[in-house]
Design a protein with these regions (language model features):
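Register position in tetratricopeptide repeats
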Residues: 73, 107-108, 141-142, 158, ...
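Boundary/linker segments of alpha-helical solenoid repeat arrays
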Residues: 40-43, 57, 129-130, 158-170
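A conserved position within tetratricopeptide repeats
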Residues: 33-37, 50, 88, 122, ...
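Alpha-helical linker/edge segments of TPR/alpha-solenoid repeat scaffolds
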Residues: 38, 42, 54-61, 144-150, ...
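Alpha-helical adaptor scaffolds
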Residues: 58-125, 130
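N-terminal leader/linker segments that initiate helical-solenoid repeat arrays
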Residues: 17-66
Length: 180
């Protein structure tokens, strides 16, 4: 029933334009992220970036985005994809809708569609570390360790002091060296 209400709400309004990745706060937040050394402070900055990415003025798309966690909890991935597809039709320049849909495709094992949405996300927001991480995970599943390593090295430029990125790079370096 909830999905029907969300889909109905999407058809009520069609012309809004503010998109997440255009937030004037993001440049400053990414600057802070590139310099932060404290992990708690880093987590706070990352949370603020996600908050900016999630913002959308279109109330119909906002309904979808506000209900993403419900789709995850219920494992209703196909309904999530349908709702996000409608959101993307309403706001085709909203990077986070593509990113969330890519995540649901990934969880369903549909890496091809996930990759398409990751590409759209990164086209709209090249600094989207969530999409970069998703891309790396897909490359790893295809055993393209060198490609995944390159993606994490790009993430490292955005998050130079992130220990989890360091660990992923270290693990991938080992996997790449085993292949040669």
């Amino acid at each position: 029933m909830k999905i029907i209400l969300i889909i109905f709400a999407l058809f009520l309004n069609i012309s809004y334009s503010y998109a997440d990745q255009n937030s004037p706060k993001l440049d400053e937040l990414f600057s802070q992220l590139s310099q932060v050394k404290d992990s708690k402070e880093q987590s706070l900055i990352i949370s603020k970036i996600w908050g900016e990415w999630m913002k959308i003025e279109n109330p119909d798309v906002k309904i979808v985005m506000d209900n993403i966690s419900d789709f995850f909890k219920s494992k209703n991935y196909q309904s999530a994809i349908s709702a996000l597809t409608l959101a993307i039709e309403l706001e085709p320049n909203y990077a986070e809708a593509y990113n969330k849909r890519a995540t649901f495709y990934f969880m369903m094992g549909d890496y091809e569609n996930s990759m398409r949405d990751i590409e759209a996300t990164l086209y709209l927001e090249p600094r989207h570390f969530g999409a970069l991480d998703g891309l790396s995970r897909i490359l790893i599943s295809y055993k393209n360790y060198d490609g995944a390593l390159k993606v994490y090295q790009e993430m490292k430029k955005l998050m130079p002091n992130d220990l989890s990125v360091d660990m992923k790079i270290e693990n991938l370096n080992q996997m790449v060296s085993k292949e040669t």
